[in-house]
Design a protein with these regions (language model features):
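S-adenosyl-L-methionine-dependent methyltransferase catalytic module, highlighting the catalytic core
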Residues: 21, 44-48, 52, 85-199
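Hydrophobic adenine-recognition pocket in adenosine-nucleotide-binding enzymes
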Residues: 80
Length: 201
């Protein structure tokens, strides 16, 4: 997404970096021309990610939002603000931390999930999602908190599911792929299990 929008960063940060694998992959891809910083408030996550530190990759057991006078070219929040109780306040504070922001937002609301309700409850219990979005409400949330959306596209997590998980799951996986190839928005709105990657300023 950065390359397609001709953005050449020198400092990239991830808030809520977890095990740090996203930053680790990016650090390997970009090399020493870019410095990467990961922030997380979980001691358990920090113990995992600190082992991946290298010359251009550093991790901090801190809340980025509490850090004064620090900013980056790009700040990433990958599957983060759906976990935050005051996500409007979180987004407003985060805006000051970087020139560009990249968000990855699970789109938990679809016709299928609303009709069944179980997937939403499972996401709440298993993943800690306490806010649920469609594409429209996700983009509106960013605009309401002062962001300007530069670019976005869907990502399809269901494609990573292994084939041996059962015929029902494989059938739904095929249905989502076929519907998505015909009409992106309709497939996302009806069948779900998509996320949104957003570039904003």
């Amino acid at each position: 997404m950065l390359k397609s929008n001709n953005i050449i960063p020198s400092r990239i940060c991830e808030i809520g970096c977890g095990a740090g694998e996203i930053l680790n992959c990016l650090a390997n891809e970009y090399g020493d021309d870019v410095v990467f910083s990961g922030y997380d408030i979980s001691p358990q996550a920090f113990e995992i990610c600190r082992k991946k530190e290298k010359q251009n990759l550093h991790f901090f057991l801190k809340d980025l939002l509490d850090e004064e006078a620090i900013s980056f070219d790009v700040v990433m929040a990958i599957d983060v603000f759906e976990h935050v109780e005051d996500y409007f306040g979180f987004l407003r504070k985060l805006k000051k931390k970087g020139t560009y922001k990249i968000f990855h937002i699970p789109l938990d609301l679809s016709v299928l999930t609303v009709l069944r309700s179980t997937p939403i409850l499972k996401g709440r219990q298993s993943f800690g999602h306490i806010h649920y979005f469609t594409k429209e409400t996700a983009l509106a949330t960013l605009k309401d908190t002062g962001y300007e959306v530069v670019d976005y596209f869907y990502t399809r997590a269901f494609l990573k599911l292994p084939r041996y998980r059962g015929w029902k799951i494989n059938l739904m996986k095929l249905s989502r792929s076929l519907c998505f190839s015909l009409h992106h928005d309709l497939a996302v709105r009806i069948l779900g299990r998509f996320s949104l990657l957003v570039l904003a300023t």
